[in-house]
């Protein structure tokens, strides 16, 4: 079993694109979305789907922490695919897998069933104190001004609540 510190180190040393002097926050927002989905009970076995619920969770994390960016756009398929270069994110190839350098959401869904995370990482993401440390490490590294956003969002779990009628598509953010 890897330690929490190992995953914090993996998260903070991720290989991310840089543009105009800024590090792309896409991978960090994807991981925060995964943590939110684990916290809310929508991901339970380490399998990360690329369904509409996951897309909405990613977009919600982006709005919450990145806000409007003049440099980056919240494109879901990019971090979902490129996280496969990290030691903890394994893409699960489908029978219709086609190798590409970049994937649109449709092509991603056609070529991969989803992604798989190690069990120990999922345990850390599910445990409140560990999840808090993982989130904080991601935000401090990849969204250094996250605490200056106009909404002053905090990492605390109680601030965000997802309501879902089918655990898949219908989410609303409650502040």
Task: Name the predicted role of every residue range.
Residues 1-175:
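Intrinsically disordered, charged low-complexity linkers and terminal tails
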């Amino acid at each position: 079993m890897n330690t929490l510190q190992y995953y914090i180190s993996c998260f903070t040393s991720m290989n991310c694109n840089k543009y105009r002097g800024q590090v792309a926050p896409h991978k960090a927002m994807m991981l925060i979305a995964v943590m939110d989905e684990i916290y809310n009970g929508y991901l339970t076995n380490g399998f990360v789907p690329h369904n509409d619920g996951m897309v909405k969770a990613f977009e919600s994390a982006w709005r919450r922490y990145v806000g409007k960016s003049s440099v980056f756009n919240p494109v879901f398929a990019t971090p979902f695919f490129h996280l496969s270069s990290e030691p903890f994110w394994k893409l699960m190839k489908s029978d219709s897998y086609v190798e590409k350098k970049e994937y649109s959401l449709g092509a991603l869904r056609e070529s991969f069933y989803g992604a798989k995370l190690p069990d120990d990482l999922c345990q850390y993401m599910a445990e409140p104190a560990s999840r808090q440390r993982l989130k904080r490490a991601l935000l401090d590294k990849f969204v250094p001004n996250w605490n200056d956003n106009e909404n002053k969002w905090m990492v605390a779990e109680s601030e965000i609540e997802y309501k879902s009628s089918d655990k898949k598509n219908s989410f609303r953010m409650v502040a």
